[in-house]
Amino acid sequence: MSEEDVKSHKIEFPCEDYPIKVIGDTVVGFRDTVIEILSKHAKVDLSTLAERQSKEGKYTTVQLHIVAESENQLHDINSALRATGIVKMVL
């Protein structure tokens, strides 16, 4: 991938419709925990909320869109979600 290709894929801030997908253990309150953390760091569009469980029910995926303001904000969101101990991956 050329430097030009990398630049063309860079996020332009603010990004009004930035998708966040959070994968974690299926536990009571997982969705609410994700929403609470995201709401502390960004404006969250709850109308985009989607939730799914893995085939065996071990993992849950919560996806929604936020207003992304900066790389630092996205880093802080990732750190806060991972600090819960129930989040396995943030995409």
Swiss-Prot record:
Cellular component, GO, one term: cytosol
Pfam family of the protein (one): DUF493
InterPro entries per UniProt: UPF0250_YbeD-like (IPR007454), YbeD-like_sf (IPR027471)
Protein family (similarity comment): Belongs to the UPF0250 family.
Protein name: UPF0250 protein PSEEN4821
